[in-house]
């Protein structure tokens, strides 16, 4: 094989065209990683929201909490079900919840409103959702118009500081705490007591009931038993599956957009690589002639120039990764199309994504280098040496 | 049996509408261990003949055999493998790869063999030593003089111990002193190491160093091979 050092040094000898081509590839890789980091962050936020150990009950046929409604009788039936885990204080770990969207003005421009999830929970909700914990302040006291604000909302919406008063549903609500939920979608919600929210919003009806399974492995049995109960018409989901499902539509669209947009940009980068490699090959025709004269076979010339093109692309890929890395952790928000609610999440640049970016760069390099390399391999020795 | 056998070779090129006949039935033998100079005016077919022997070009008709191998009938892939083992080629403009050191340039043909790294190192050192450039192994071509570049190219041509060395105007771009050095080296390779050498040259002084001079004109050998003065001495 033609030694790789020949290609590496040839690349270094033409720094301007190498840098420009690598930058082109780098920008595409950065956009590719950035967009997938967005989709990744969105999926991760929702995936982390649900727990495998919890089950979620909705009205039969409801595909989101918004379209669901369950009466107090259903809440009582579920609380008494033997599949529900029991807390040390002997109370069932069940949280019948009110789920509504309220329009709130954003902090930088209060004329822009976003639909924020307001979730009325039972006292047990804080135990049922083991990933949720108060980071600052005191939990809302029972019987009072208190709310706890998810930490992702604090920076984005006004009047969310502890001790401040939020106004929604025609009433004032005192912010008594902030909570974190391991980066999940709960962090984009406002929680208060379900009994306080019920009369204000949708009357004597809960939107969902979430409970901790006594045995998470026995979910199927719990589902069969509850769905078969003639006293109610409900669907039972594993909480983790429910939130994964919620992320599917927008997550898929974001992923699709990432591929679409970067594919279009990649065409430009590939043409850049083609141009660079054609120029390199035409100026190095005598060198190729020498290699063929020495006895290197045409396919080794092809592989050598493909490797050179891939090498330039890898430089571009590394640049792209460096451009994209600072995106990691940046918080952004969007409307989840499954629930129509604002959800804030972080860009997630994972090692796998960086690897995918580098692989994408190599693919661009190989595609861009193929036809020039083929031309190099097909050069007639006598003509190449002239 | 001659080492190089050229039998009734025709070679023509198409240039736009015009057909140019370079050889029309050339027959020639080159013996093993000979040192042959091919002379003649530009366009007489000297370089084409060298290319045919090296398998870089194919005759329109006729056969070229080198050490019994039917060069004119091999596929490009077979030719590449055959050239790597049998041909050491030296160009007028040296044609060293500018991004590789003298050592790496000389090592190139050995990368096509099954020699170990250690064996390759020994062979490269020996070849550079033979051409008197052992101390320039780490120099890049731009750091060498023309004569040194050509001697490096000769080291590259001999390192794999080929059957035939073919040199196309090896002194064409060198000053008188460097030319003498290169020609002396070629004589040494022929006499001490029994290398079969064919050089194409315009330079009568260079041709005088060969044992045999062949004159080509318009594709024909215009006189019988004659023994050069150097060989007669």
Can you annotate each of these PLM segments?
Chain B
Residues 2-218:
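ABC family nucleotide-binding domain
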């Amino acid at each position: 094989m033609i030694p790789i050092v020949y290609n590496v040094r040839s690349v270094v000898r033409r720094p301007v065209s190498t840098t420009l081509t690598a930058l082109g590839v780098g920008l595409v890789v950065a956009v590719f990683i950035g967009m997938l980091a967005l989709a990744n962050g969105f999926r991760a936020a929702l995936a982390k929201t649900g727990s495998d150990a919890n089950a979620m009950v909705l009205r039969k046929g409801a595909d989101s909490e918004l379209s669901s409604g369950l009466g107090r009788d259903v809440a009582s039936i579920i609380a008494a079900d033997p599949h529900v885990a029991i807390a040390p204080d002997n109370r069932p770990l069940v949280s019948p919840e009110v789920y509504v969207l309220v329009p709130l003005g954003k902090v930088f421009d209060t004329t822009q409103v976003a639909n924020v999830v307001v979730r009325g929970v039972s006292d047990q909700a804080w135990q049922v959702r083991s990933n949720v914990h108060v980071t600052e302040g005191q939990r809302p006291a029972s019987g009072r118009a208190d709310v706890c604000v998810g930490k992702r909302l604090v920076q984005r919406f006004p009047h969310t500081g502890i001790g401040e008063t939020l106004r929604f549903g025609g009433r004032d609500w005192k912010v008594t705490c902030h909570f974190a939920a391991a980066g999940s979608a709960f962090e984009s919600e406002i929680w208060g007591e379900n009994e306080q929210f019920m009369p204000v919003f949708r009357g004597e009806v809960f939107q969902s009931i979430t409970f901790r399974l006594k045995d998470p492995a026995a979910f199927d049995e719990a589902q069969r038993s509850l769905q078969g109960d003639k006293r109610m018409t409900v669907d039972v989901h594993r909480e983790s599956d429910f939130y994964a499902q919620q992320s599917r539509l927008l997550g898929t669209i974001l992923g699709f957009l990432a591929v679409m947009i970067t594919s279009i940009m990649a065409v430009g980068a590939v043409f850049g690589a083609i141009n660079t490699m054609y120029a390199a090959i035409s100026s190095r025709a005598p060198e190729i002639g020498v290699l063929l004269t020495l006895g290197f076979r045409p396919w080794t010339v092809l592989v050598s120039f493909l490797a050179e093109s891939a090498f330039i692309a890898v430089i571009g890929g590394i640049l792209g990764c460096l451009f994209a890395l600072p995106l990691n952790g940046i918080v952004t928000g969007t409307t989840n199309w499954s629930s129509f609610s604002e959800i804030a999440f972080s860009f997630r640049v994972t090692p796998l994504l960086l690897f995918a970016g580098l692989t994408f760069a190599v693919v661009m390099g190989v595609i861009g280098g193929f036809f020039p390399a083929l031309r190099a391999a097909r050069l007639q020795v006598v003509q190449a040496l002239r | 049996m001659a080492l190089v056998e050229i039998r009734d070779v025709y070679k023509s090129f198409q240039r736009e509408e015009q057909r140019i006949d370079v050889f029309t039935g050339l027959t020639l033998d080159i013996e093993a261990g000979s040192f042959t100079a091919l002379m003649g005016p530009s366009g007489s077919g000297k370089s084409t003949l060298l290319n045919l022997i090296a398998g870089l070009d194919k005759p329109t008709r006729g056969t070229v055999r080198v050490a019994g191998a039917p060069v004119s009938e091999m596929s490009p892939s077979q030719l590449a493998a055959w050239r790597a083992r049998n041909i050491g080629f030296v160009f007028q403009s040296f044609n060293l790869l500018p991004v590789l050191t003298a050592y790496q340039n000389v090592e190139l043909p050995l990368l096509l063999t099954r020699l170990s790294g250690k064996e390759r190192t020994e062979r490269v050192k020996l070849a550079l030593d033979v051409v008197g450039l052992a101390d320039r192994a780490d120099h890049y071509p731009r750091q060498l003089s023309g004569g040194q570049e050509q001697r490096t190219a000769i080291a590259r041509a001999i390192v794999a111990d080929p059957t035939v060395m073919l040199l196309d105007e090896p002194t064409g771009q060198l000053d008188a002193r460097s030319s003498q050095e290169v020609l002396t080296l070629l004589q040494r390779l022929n006499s001490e190491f029994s290398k079969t050498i064919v050089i194409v040259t315009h330079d009568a002084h260079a041709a005088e160093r060969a044992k045999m001079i062949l004159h080509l004109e318009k594709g024909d050998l215009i006189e019988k091979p004659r023994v050069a003065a150097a060989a007669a001495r």
